Structure formats: structure tokens, C-alpha cells
């Protein structure tokens, strides 16, 4: 989305408020409550309130404003961001060994996101619905059922796209942030003493006074910056400047005012700790605020769901996940997609989490490990980009990395205390996703290498066929080829069993480049290998969906005319068996077989009419 047009800047900035800041914008619902709820051994004490507020404020400044908005967002791939993009950028100018390490870091970060995404909708919506306890305490038993109902409706509408509903996101979230600011300012005016907490000395005094307990309490403070990765991940949708402008003009002031307003309330009324956010509002505003909070948390959940769809598509296109059905819900916006399998798997996981944890305070114990783990990895990857890609001074880069890690590592370490009380959940989910992604990538590479090693030379085969041609039949045959310069298995088996060849043979390779988009000028490369053989290589970015009909159109413009309904597509269907291996590699091989059996078939991936496809089987040992 371009920001060159100054007239569109306010609209883009407003849209960024509606999508990018949903998660971090709903953190005031539960953050300060969890910090001062008594779980760390101290109650609502003046020094504790000032200490937590100071920590929250300076985390928002250092982590969000300086680290992500100023530094990390400099690293973009054709305007796109996200942990996998950062991984790709970091590995461009490094040795093979270093690249492997960076890839592992990027995959761990992506896996952490999958672990986090299960918790975000649950804790956000439950925190909003828990406002019922203030309005009508007798309805507290309805919190879990109502949360499930709200999220069920949200997941059900995903298949229809969020284009129409999405237009309401921005004004609702802008209203939300303005209400945050007004409620906080109202309380601060009544007790301006709370503004002393802006001084970082209070954060230092907090550590000195409470010692070990203060370190553990960082696990609650980090709730104030959950969703920070969305700022970088959504950079491609809105651009750097609108995201930064939205933060510094609307989001940051509103969050600070609300957190400090809650602190001012607690200094006067410590009993308000049961839900300081909703108790900021006058009685007459509780129900409207409850409704607005529910809408804001739904929007925050929607942003996370859309984020997991985008990450999944990127992982599929880069070869880290098996192909799956991806539906475009908008003809205008390529980023609006729906992945049915991911949608309903995520829904099931979220419902299980809500039923199991029952209250947002219990879920808060599970939140944070994945977020802070990703923060550590982002620091390492982004500074690698600064050194290798931007060629910054190595001492400056080292200084920046140390500064980032001095914040990230204590936050991550403090969250490890949550491991047994719920932190195991995102880590377990992340481990599962990491295992799946590394298994698919490594076993796929092993399979392609084996096909290359046991394949016949393409040039020699074509020369032999032209010299001693088999029976030719009219028409065009397209053979999907994964490996260049090697004869596709489907071509070999067609000659072996049918002993015929079409008049024109096209060897088609579809590949994904290390970029979000590929310009149409570079989309197709055509090479005539002989009078009757052509090789076509079609390149796509990881944000694009390969389409054979489009490839044919491009071929026609280059002089190679093809008609979809007059062409036969030959594909090989590998029947895989696991060979002799150590037991742990056999397990990985069996997991790959399971993933491969459930992967989307090639004709469906590339939108080829089923009645034009001929699949020839072959057995391959991995």
C-alpha cells in the first residue's frame, strides 16, 4: 500500500490503527490487573504501582518505539516484513553454516507465533466478557460460554472474507483508543501524583526493593507489549510511515494514559484491583464499554487469525509446510485469504484453551514465553541484517544487539517461571509446528536430491528422442518438472508404458523466489531445447499463487501459444516408502508420509482442470 499520495495518508494510518494495533491495544484489559493481583507476594502498594507503571512505560518506549518501529522495520523485503522475511534477509550474505543457523532461528520464531496465536483470541475475548462480573456478578458462569459463542461466530465468517466487516475495524479501534485515553486522563486528573512513575528511577527502585520477586514479575509486565510482532509483520499492508504515525500520534499516548489512569485509580482505591480497567468507567458507561471492549477484542483476534493465514501461506510457498487449500476472499486484495484447515484447527485449539483455563488470569500465565522468545530471535536476526546487508560498523551492531538482549533475555527468563502454570502450552504447540516445518523441508529436499541423483540427463534424452523419435500424436503435452535438467518421471513412464510422445512437449517448472512478488516481465522464461521440446520456468513470489493459465497467457505473449483445454498435463505421483534409517529418522520419515498424503494435489495447487490431468505413479524410497 503506497503512501506517496499525501491525501491517502490519513486513511492508511486509520486502517493501520484498525488492524496492526488490535492485540497490543487490548492489553490494558488485563496487564496491570495481573501485575498487582497478589500472585507475586505484594498487593497494591505505592512503590509497586509506580514500579510497574514505570516498567510498562519504558518497555513501550524501548521495545516498541525504538527497537521495532525505528530499527527492525528498516529490514524489509520489497516492503514486506515478518519473522520469515527477516530470516530470509539475514541469510543472504552469510556462509552456508550461518544461514542454516539463521533459518532454524526464523523457523523457531514462526513456530512461536503459532503457539501464541492460540492464546491471543482466547485471552482477549475472555478479558472483555469478564466485564460482566462488574455489571452483573451473577452472570460470571456465562463468561466461558459467551466467549465461545463470540469466537465461533468470528471463525465462521472467515470463509466469507473480512472485506466488508474490515471497513468497520478502523473507526471502532480509533474509538477504542480515544476511550482508553479519556478514561485514563479522567483518573490521572483526579490523582496526578501517578505521573511520577514516568521517571525510570521508579523502575530501578522496584528491582532494588523487591529483588527476586521483581524479576519474576517481569512475566506479567510483558503482557503490555504482546502483539508487537504484528507491527513488523503487517508492514507490507500499510507501509512503515503510517504504522509509525499511528503509534506515536494515537496508540502510544492512549495506552500510556490508560495504564497511568488505572494506576491512579488503584492508589486511591486498592480494592479496584479485581478489574481496574472497567472500574475506570462511571457506572452508566459500563455496558457501552463492555460492548466496545468485546468488539475491540474480536478485531484483535481477527488480526491474529489473518496473520496466521499469511504466515501459513508464506511457509507453504517457501517450502516449509505441505501445500494446502488457500482461498482468496477478495478480488482486489491479494492479502485477504482463507485457509479452511488452519481456520478450523485454530478454532478447535482456542475452544479447548478457553474451556481448560476458564479465566483470562489463568491464561495470562501461559502468555509471554512465545512473545519474548520471538523478541530474542528478532534481535539476533535484525542485527545480522544490519551487519551483513547494510554493512553497519560491527562495533555499533554489537552494541545494539547487547542493548536489545539486555531487555529481551530478562523478559524471556522471567516468563520461564510460567512454564508449569501454562507456559508449556505455547512451547508445546511451537515445538509441534517446528517439527512439522523442518520435517517437510528436509524430507522434501532429500526426495528431490534422490530424484536428481537417479534421474537421466535431459539433454541426452532429448537428443536420443529427436534422433530416434517414438510415435508422435497430435497436441501439446506439459510435464511438470521439479528439478531442472532432469527428465520428469512422468515423461519416462509415459514413454515406457504408452510408447508415444506428443507433437509438442513443454517441461514446466514453477518456482518460488525469495521475494513477495515477481514482476510480470520476469514471470516466464522460455527456452527451446529442440524443435519439439520447450522448457518453461515460471517464477512467483511467496505472496502470489501460481496459476498455470496465467503462465500459458505469458507464453502466448512470448510466441509459445498454448490452450489450456487442448493440452494434456502429465504429472508423477510418488508412492513413498521409508528406507532403512535410525529409529528417529524413521519417525520423521513416517511424519513426512502422513503430511504428503494429506497435502493438496498439484492440479488443485496450480488450478489445472482435472479432466486435463494424467497422473503416472512411481515408487521412491526416502
From Swiss-Prot:
Keywords: Cell inner membrane, Cell membrane, Ion transport, Membrane, Potassium, Potassium transport, Symport, Transmembrane, Transmembrane helix, Transport. It is a multi-pass membrane protein. The keyword Cell membrane applies. InterPro entries: K+_transporter (IPR003855), K_trans_C (IPR053952), K_trans_N (IPR053951), Kup (IPR023051). The chain crosses the membrane at residues 9-29, 49-69, 103-123, 137-157, 165-185, 213-233, 247-267, 276-296, 337-357, 363-383, 396-416, 419-439. Pfam families: K_trans (PF02705), K_trans_C (PF22776). Disulfide bonds: none annotated. It is found in: Cell inner membrane. GO terms for molecular function: potassium ion transmembrane transporter activity; symporter activity. GO terms for cellular component: plasma membrane. It catalyses: K(+)(in) + H(+)(in) = K(+)(out) + H(+)(out). The keyword Cell inner membrane applies. Responsible for the low-affinity transport of potassium into the cell. Likely operates as a K(+):H(+) symporter. Belongs to the HAK/KUP transporter (TC 2.A.72) family. HAMAP family: Kup (MF_01522). This is Low affinity potassium transport system protein Kup. It comes from Salmonella arizonae (strain ATCC BAA-731 / CDC346-86 / RSK2980).
